[in-house]
């Protein structure tokens, strides 16, 4: 059983190509092209519907499924986008999507942010933060009886940028470099039922 990677993806480009690729994805996921365990949202339906193959040396990765497709919206004058969410085994399948876009929406760009907790896999290609501004993920839980609970001002799962992370940790531990602050946070005494994890998102 794989660990599932959650990916948020944005396709951006000219209105006609954005609307067309969204329409095609909806069309490809309206039926099953082959037997699978995921239903119509299976990524393999997108691969096969687009005229590609999966499996083997040259096949496209498609183990997973689309969970949601957003509406087309305007980003800037003449520039449109829609967002899509999918799960895949262990890591994102951005290469599969890139190949499909090159064929059906060559003027479109793809931005994504992928996270797989068990493998400590957190990446994004959105270096300019057009859609995904977070730089860190806080994964924590402290019991009410923990002495640090009152000071720990983070949600159990929180997306945050480095500047805000440093400011909030400095309020708890005092002024020091971000790496030292993160080390302090990770070393908070916890029970077997508690945890403090800070994941830094890697830019690719």
Model-derived features: positions:
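Intrinsic low-complexity, intrinsically disordered or marginally ordered coil/linker segments
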Residues: 1-204
């Amino acid at each position: 059983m794989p660990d599932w990677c959650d990916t948020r993806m944005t396709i951006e480009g000219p209105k006609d190509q954005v609307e067309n690729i969204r329409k095609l994805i909806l069309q490809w996921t309206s039926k099953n092209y082959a037997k699978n365990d995921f239903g119509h949202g299976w990524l393999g339906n997108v691969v096969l519907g687009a005229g590609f193959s999966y499996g083997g040396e040259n096949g496209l990765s498609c183990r997973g499924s689309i969970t949601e497709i957003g509406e087309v919206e305007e980003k800037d004058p003449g520039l449109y986008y829609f967002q899509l969410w999918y799960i895949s085994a262990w890591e994102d399948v951005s290469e599969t999507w890139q190949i499909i876009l090159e064929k059906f929406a060559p003027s479109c760009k793809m931005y994504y942010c992928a996270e797989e907790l068990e493998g400590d896999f957190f990446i994004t290609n959105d270096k300019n933060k057009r859609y995904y501004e977070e730089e860190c993920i806080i994964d924590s839980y402290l019991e009410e009886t923990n002495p640090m609970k009152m000071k720990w001002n983070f949600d159990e799962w929180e997306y945050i940028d480095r500047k805000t992370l440093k400011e909030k940790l400095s309020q708890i531990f005092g002024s020091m470099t971000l790496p030292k602050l993160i080390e302090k946070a990770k070393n908070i005494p916890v029970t077997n039922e508690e945890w403090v994890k800070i994941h830094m998102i890697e830019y690719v």
